[in-house]
Curated annotation (Swiss-Prot):
Pfam family, one: DUF520
Highest taxon of source: Bacteria
UniProt-recorded name of the protein: Nucleotide-binding protein PSPA7_4966
Function noted in UniProt: Nucleotide-binding protein.
Upper lineage: Bacteria, Pseudomonadati, Pseudomonadota, Gammaproteobacteria, Pseudomonadales
One GO CC term, this protein: cytosol
Length: 159
């Protein structure tokens, strides 16, 4: 039976490249000279600046570099800024994988449209199976058209 997996993966290498490009752009910006910096750790980035408006500009720089590297900014989880001595810091975490709530929402969408496919939650991915390849392509088109708050990829398509 044909099947495919719905996953939400983050390309860590492209994320690292985007952060490195943001650091280079930060060095070139005259208005952000001083105590502005990006610190990348695994799947999170810490923004440090002297004022809140600088953090907003740094966040825009990071978003633009993510878009250039084709990393979807929907996976960004921006936390509130907090003061740390004379500087202000802000955490940006990058989410990966499909959580239970989103998986249930995906399965519910597929069942609601009464497509001739079955969806099953398997950890951090959703496996969709059906008798015909066309039904699976219809399910992919349905999920691409919905705004679910996380970037979705469709992998492991088998006939």
């Amino acid at each position: 039976m044909p099947s495919f997996d719905v996953v939400s993966e983050l390309d860590k290498h492209e994320l690292t490249n985007a952060v490195d490009n943001a650091i280079k752009e930060l060095d070139r910006r005259f208005d952000l000279k001083g105590k502005c910096s990006f610190e990348a750790k695994d799947k999170s980035v810490t923004l440090t600046a002297e004022a809140d408006f600088m953090l907003e500009q740094m966040l825009d720089i990071l978003r633009s570099n993510l878009v250039k590297r084709k990393v979807d900014s929907q996976c960004m989880e921006v936390k509130d800024a907090y003061p740390s001595g004379k500087v202000v810091k802000q955490e940006v975490n990058f989410r990966e994988g499909i959580d239970k709530d989103l998986a249930k929402k995906i399965v519910g969408l597929i069942k609601e449209r009464k497509l001739k496919v079955q969806a099953a939650i398997q950890g951090e991915q959703v496996r969709v199976t059906g008798k015909k390849r066309d039904d699976l392509q219809e399910a992919i088109a349905l999920l691409r058209g919905e705004s679910l708050g996380m970037p979705l990829q469709f992998t492991n398509f088998r006939d």
